[in-house]
Amino acid sequence: MPEGDQGAPPGRRVTSPHRGLRRATTERAILECVAAESGPLTRAELARRTAISPPAVSEAVRRLEAGRVLVAVGPRSGVPGAVATLYDLAPGVGVVAAVEIHRTAVRAAVGDLLGRMLETTDHDPPRDGHDVLARLHEALAEVRARWEARGRPLRAVAVSIANPVDPATGRVVELHESAFPAGVLGADDVRGVDPAMVVLDNDVNFAALAERDHGAATGAPSFAYLHVGERDSVGLGLVVDGVLVRGARGLAGEIGYLPLGGGSERFRFGEAMAAQGLGAGEDAPDEAGLATAGRMLGEAAVAVCAIVDPGMLVLGGPVGLRPGLLRHVAATVVELAPREVPVVAGALGGTAPLRGALAEARRRAWEGLVSARG
């Protein structure tokens, strides 16, 4: 009896456990290849790009087409030789959504699994901290109804919130002067989506991921994203060797709580920043206020450099990108950092948290799509 068939019922074929893994690996490679392209591909093109044998690619494409994951969209035109069929992601695979929640705004975005943003919408902000869940459900209900009516179900959701999120519990953490109360939202509170397909994280973390993937930090394995947001809230997203650092309780990067001064003059860094009047809705500060704020941000950045040695510093957020602030931050870093560290402006502006969240929802959807076929 062949090895592996011992104990099998007569007449029943035993499949190697490695076969399913090979199939899943091939399908993942094909789907990742489709995701990386702006247009559909033929089986031959998929085989060349993935370096997988044409027969294995053809078999995988047949499985994906039968499972309504890929769809034939027509022949390849304008090339010599036999007519080849193009394949693209099937619309029925669905869409992903991201929702960004702040005290003053709720924004939603919908994208497909190929990385294209399909729409953005604005929604009523929460009346208070306990209204967050209701606003989230309203935004997602609108998104779900609109896209399911088009035959495109909601596959994954990412929620960006202006609070830390405990990675162990998946729930919002409350700190002094943070936007929302503790536990106001958790990943398991999102309705109508498999909990495994829900991501909840801090807005600065999502912004850092967006700058890593599509912004100023593209290609940088280690960097620090320094974010100055609404009401002069200050946070840091830290990426080391390509991985976002969250900390044991999701508090990594909460530099607004750095203590400054001494004795009776002791105060928090975030409070000192707020005193400079740099708010996004305020008039432009005078040069002295800008220089003071830039100096404080630069000193905080130098402390980060001394501990984690990032390859670059990215300054972002609606307040962090105010004209003139960057040069003061950079000058302080040049003066005080142990080694030279480039300081650059974020490339994505105020869209960074929402774009980062949408990309994370898409990543989760891809994982679910492939694992469901493994």
Which sequence ranges carry the predicted segments?
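Short glycine-aspartate micro-motif
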Residues: 96-100, 154-158, 223-227, 235
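Glycine-rich phosphate-binding loop and adjoining helix at the ATP-binding site
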Residues: 122-222, 269, 324-335
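ATP-binding/phosphotransfer module of carbohydrate and carboxylate kinases, centering on a glycine-rich
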Residues: 1-75, 79-122, 131-142, 260-374
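Short secondary-structure boundary segments
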Residues: 161, 228-230, 312, 317-318
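Short beta-strand scaffold segments in enzyme catalytic cores
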Residues: 106-110, 209, 234-238
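Conserved phosphate-binding catalytic cores of ATP/NTP-utilizing and phosphoryl-transfer enzymes
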Residues: 75, 79-96, 198-226
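Glycine-rich phosphate-binding loop plus the immediately following alpha-helix
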Residues: 188, 195-196, 200, 204, ...
